[in-house]
Swiss-Prot record:
SMART domains: RNA_pol_Rpb6. Belongs to the RNA polymerase subunit omega family. One of its GO terms (biological process) is DNA-templated transcription. Promotes RNA polymerase assembly. Latches the N- and C-terminal regions of the beta' subunit thereby facilitating its interaction with the beta and alpha subunits. It comes from Sphingopyxis alaskensis (strain DSM 13593 / LMG 18877 / RB2256). It catalyses: RNA(n) + a ribonucleoside 5'-triphosphate = RNA(n+1) + diphosphate. This is DNA-directed RNA polymerase subunit omega. Keywords: DNA-directed RNA polymerase, Nucleotidyltransferase, Transcription, Transferase. GO terms for cellular component: DNA-directed RNA polymerase complex. Its EC number is 2.7.7.6. PANTHER family: DNA-DIRECTED RNA POLYMERASE SUBUNIT OMEGA.
Length: 114
């Protein structure tokens, strides 16, 4: 197989920095066991990822969405209504904390300032 260069892929992903991010993400997917869309030909995962992009066997838009999804730490929930189970859980936690708190001293007795 001929060497894969950035010039082979730059017409599919015009920004070289995006190309690096997408191909690195795809190489990590391949390392994780994702199915190959081209023959390996004894190439390492980054080269296979670049070949997949160059031969258009995988869409850069799909890679971009997968990359963004893998980097998100919080999943945004479109549902604005509070979840009944989480509301009950918060109430139960508040009751547990209240029950575990030390008892208060009576209002006028036993204070440090008399």
């Amino acid at each position: 197989m001929a060497r894969v260069t950035v010039e082979d892929c730059v017409d599919k992903v015009p920004n070289r920095f995006d190309l690096v991010l997408l191909s690195a993400h795809r190489a990590r997917e391949i390392s994780g066991g994702s199915e190959l869309t081209v023959d390996r030909d004894r190439d390492k995962n980054p080269v296979v990822a670049l070949r997949e992009i160059a031969e258009q066997t995988i869409r850069p838009k799909d890679l971009h969405e997968a990359l963004v999804g893998s980097l998100q730490k919080v999943v945004i929930d479109d549902d604005d209504t509070p979840d009944e189970i989480s509301s009950i859980s918060r109430s139960a936690e508040a009751l547990r904390l209240t029950a575990a708190a030390p008892p208060r001293s009576p209002a006028g007795g036993g204070g440090d300032f008399e």
